[in-house]
Amino acid sequence: FQRNATEGLTCLDPAPRWAVWPGRGTICFGRSPKAARIVADIKDHTIRAIQHAEALGGWTTLPERDVFDVEYWVLEQAKLARSGPPLQLAGKIALVTGAASGIGLACAHELLSLGAVVGAVDVDPEVVHLMDSDAWVGIECDVAEDVAMAEAVKTVVRQYGGLDII
């Protein structure tokens, strides 16, 4: 950013958005499931374009300045300025027990409203279908059963990449 920036530009988050997982494939990262899906879509198109270019005789990256100009395009900067700051818990992953009703459900809704994704655990099978959101994974589980609870935690970690709030 420092080598190419002009006055008035807002530095984008420099964290990687996707990575190669040797022997497995690729992993995409984002502050929300929607953001990760957008990264996955761009990554898929980029990989296909590179493969087609290689098949046609070769591919090289753009010079750093050209990549910077694309990333820091005036309209992209305007969009970022309008979007405002991220929600307080954006990028956080929560696990809530008793999430099908009462206090557990209220806590899950509050965490969602603050930007977290929620692994919602309850003995009630309805927890699976309570929310139609990619920020919610409902898991039928009896928290008194250690093996089932360990599997619930693994499900959340596999789906969202970690666990920050219990």
Tell me the role of every PLM-derived stretch.
Residues R24, A94-V96, D142, V156:
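Conserved small-residue
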Residues C141-E151:
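The beta1-alpha1 cofactor-binding region of Rossmann-like NAD(H)/NADP(H)-dependent oxidoreductases
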Residues V128, M149-V156:
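A conserved hydrophobic alpha-helix of the Rossmann-fold in NAD(P)-dependent oxidoreductases
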